[in-house]
């Protein structure tokens, strides 16, 4: 090794094994954070969710992407099929299933297949969807005494963190035991952003209620070990989609403005050359 190479190494250090680990001109301004899976969502969840929903509302490409994914993932609905060899039993089960499909929605707005599409859409836009299993009384007259209630992720306060006297801990609204297992969800009775407009606002809507984890299906995509909350699926494309939307708008206005200008060539005598 020459004296020049030794001097360079002393001044700037040895070349890194990986280019991205170096401090060259291309990486000098790249100073990423490295929060844990729980801390990352605590810091960014509300912002990402708000921007994701805003973009889906006003951006045709984002909306089309969500609609296409839901159509491909759910279609007309994911349907179970009995594998029983008893044809009579199979027919009875399928008939019972068809009856329950129409009664599955606790809000009474759609059927079970509609709930699948709605849950998938909520997960894509907001990062997660909470599905509460609501047991019903026999006198309610349902074919199966069970209904499903879909809740947006805002019902589960991500900033709710506490250490309980029982030894359990609450992290991002979810209660864990000392083995790290989910034992309960602490949910708002109504959507916190609806205020007095929410149907449950008069029943302590801004207070949380503890729901056993067995009654909750927490639908989200796990991307990291230890992750407890979901992130919107458009998170990595939000900035570019927003910039593309603004560019497209500006280009449209530019062309519209240019089309409004017209020029005329006049001459004294029709026989004169231009």
What is the predicted role of each segment?
Residues 70-105, 116:
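Low-complexity, highly charged intrinsically disordered N-terminal segments
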Residues 2-63, 67, 110-114, 120-274:
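Structured, contiguous alpha/beta core segments that scaffold functional sites
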């Amino acid at each position: 090794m020459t004296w020049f190479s030794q001097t360079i190494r002393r001044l700037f250090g040895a070349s890194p094994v990986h280019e991205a680990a170096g401090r060259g001109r291309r990486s000098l301004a790249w100073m990423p954070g490295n929060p844990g899976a729980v801390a990352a969502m605590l810091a960014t969840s509300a912002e990402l969710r708000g921007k994701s929903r805003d973009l889906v509302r006003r951006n045709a490409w984002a909306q089309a992407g969500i609609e296409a994914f839901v159509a491909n993932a759910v279609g007309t609905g994911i349907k179970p099929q009995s594998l029983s060899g008893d044809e009579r039993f199979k027919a009875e089960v399928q008939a019972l299933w068809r009856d329950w499909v129409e009664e599955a929605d606790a809000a009474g707005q759609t059927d079970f297949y509609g709930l699948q599409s709605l849950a998938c859409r909520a997960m894509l836009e907001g990062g997660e969807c909470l599905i509460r299993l609501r047991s019903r009384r026999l006198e309610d007259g349902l074919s199966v005494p069970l209904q499903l209630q879909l809740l947006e992720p805002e019902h589960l306060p991500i900033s709710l963190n506490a250490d309980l006297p029982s030894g359990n801990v609450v992290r991002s609204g979810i209660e864990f035991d000392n083995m790290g297992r989910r034992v309960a969800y602490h949910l708002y009775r109504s959507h916190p952003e609806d205020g007095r407009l929410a149907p449950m606002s008069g029943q302590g809507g801004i207070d949380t209620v503890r729901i056993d984890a067995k009654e909750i299906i927490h639908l989200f995509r796990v991307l990291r070990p230890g992750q407890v909350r979901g992130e919107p699926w458009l998170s990595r494309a939000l900035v570019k989609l927003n910039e593309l939307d603004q560019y497209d708008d500006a280009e449209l206005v530019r062309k519209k403005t240019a089309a409004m200008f017209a020029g005329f060539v006049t001459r004294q005598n029709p026989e004169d050359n231009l």
